[in-house]
Every structure is written in structure tokens, then in C-alpha cells.
């Protein structure tokens, strides 16, 4: 009997310790349950999905050009079967298809390359960001970053009983608990995801140094961008910033040069050579670092670039059009869109 009482006492002590840990990490939003169950179902049912407006997809904008990857070094000719005029070094290179004549592809005026060094047409991302309501959102909004089934409880394996969520699905983050130093977010009744599986949108206060009415905040940790009018967030999306070798610099900048289409290239005769024709909706803000549309990948939410801030074509067009009236050239020393780059957490590559 004495041994049984000892075991019962030990079990109760362990349960108390576990509950205490949950109480400390639970955010207690609208009655969070500290037993790792999260918010009551009826509370989440009042806000079953984010109250945001999906940016519409304009196929005529996305597919107005054909892009192909250059898969091997080649020469550029002045006509199909004509004379070589330059070398194309391969590397990370994409071109615009202007026309096709037999086994030749025109990539610019009087510039042709053999079609056999080109990939099939590039599949352009149809991802797009969200417009935000005037009133504050009741819960943080996030995007699911990989296809998954949520776990039934924090720290558990994916549950086949939960719905399958596709990458880029938008979810509310109702609350969280911390396990082993990492957050597990509740996104629905008995639905939990690890913090590495979401990209969270968190509006910030306007930095005192921002002088323009319209500005954007770029969070390198979450890989998100939020556009603001004054203090009010109006738009949010996923981006891809620079890789560790080519980081996007933190700080406050202003757009100083805009192009609806421009060619980007660099690292000539090096392993990381790149050449990208007709990069859409480009806004330079920090030397040769720019915000721009991206037709060559669909990896938004992850670092991917040589320093630029990659956006989907839909998002880049929206941002370019929304901010084009910020600079008043009739006003001396007026400034274009402010770009505030920061990190909300510590990135560990």
C-alpha cells in the first residue's frame, strides 16, 4: 500500500510539472487551455479562416511571355544559321522566347540560339499574396510552407485524421505552446504545426525614420513582406531573399530606380554566373538589390536569391502599381517607396 501511494504521488507530480510547462508557454488567447488542447472549438469556429482577400490571378499578366532555361553554354547568332555574335555562358540563365524558326529560337532583336540548348517552357508560379482588412485581424495569419497533415497535439507526428493541407494554404495561428524551444501553433481543433512549417505575417510599428506614406517591411526570418499606408498594413505576401552567401542587407532604404522589364546578370565567367532576361516589375533599393517579379522558381517563403527580394509576378506587379505614385518628381528631394528590411528571429541555415 505504501509503495502504491508513492507511485501515485510521483505520477501526480509529473502531471503537475507538465501542466505547469504548458501554462508558461500557452499564450492564453481567449481562454487557451493549458493542458495542450489549445483554444475551445467554439472560439475557433467564430474565426474559422483568415479574414483576408486573396489577390486575384491575371493569366494575361503571368503568361504574356514564354521563358526557357539555357541548359548549356552556346553561341548567339545574328540569324537562324547565321554568324555568331557573342557567347552565352550557360550558368543560371533564362531567356525570353520571341519566336521560333525551325531549330532556332529568337531571344532578342537579331539574336538567335539553337533550340536544343533550351528547356521546355518554364512553369510560372501562380502564387499570390493577400489584401488585408481595415480592422485588425483577431489572430496572426500564416502560410503553410509544405504539404502536410497537422498533428493532433503539440509535438506529435502528423495525423491522418486531420485534413491534408497544401503548401501556401492560409491559416489562423490561434495560440501556441513551446516544446524543446520551438513553437507549435494551433491552426484548428486538434490541429498543430511546428513553427518551421509556417511563415507568419506579423505587422510592425512604423519605424520613426520612414519618411514616406507608403512603405514595406521585409522580415528576413519569416520571409514575408507587408505593405503599409502610414501605420496601416494593407497587403502581405511571401518572398524569397538572399541566400547566406549573398545576403539581403538589413536596414532602411528607398526605391531609387524602376523598370517594368529589365535584364539582370552577374558573376561573369564564374560558377554562380546568372543571366535573367526581362525580369518584371523591378524596383532597385540597395545598390544592385531589388524587389522584382520572379518567373524561374516557386520557392517563396524560403531564401533563394543572390540578394534580391524575389516575389511572384502577381505580387510584384501589385506592389509596383500600388507604389508608383509615392514619388512626386515635382517636389524637390521627394523620396520613393521606403523599404525596411529586418529580422524578427535568428536564422540558422
What are these regions (language model features)?
Residues 1-8:
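Bacterial N-terminal signal peptides that target proteins for export
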Residues 8-16:
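Bacterial N-terminal signal peptides
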Residues 23, 209-211, 235, 243, ...:
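Exported/periplasmic cell-wall-interacting domains
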Residues 23-64, 108-142, 186-215:
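Boundary regions of SH3-family modules and the immediately adjacent low-complexity/disordered segments
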Residues 24-32, 82-119, 163-199:
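SH3/SH3-like beta-barrel superfamily modules
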Residues 78, 129-174:
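Short, solvent-exposed interaction modules
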Residues 87-90, 163, 223, 314-321:
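Solvent-exposed, polar/charged alpha-helical surfaces in well-ordered, non-transmembrane soluble domains
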Residues 157-249:
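Cell wall/extracellular polymer interaction/catalysis modules
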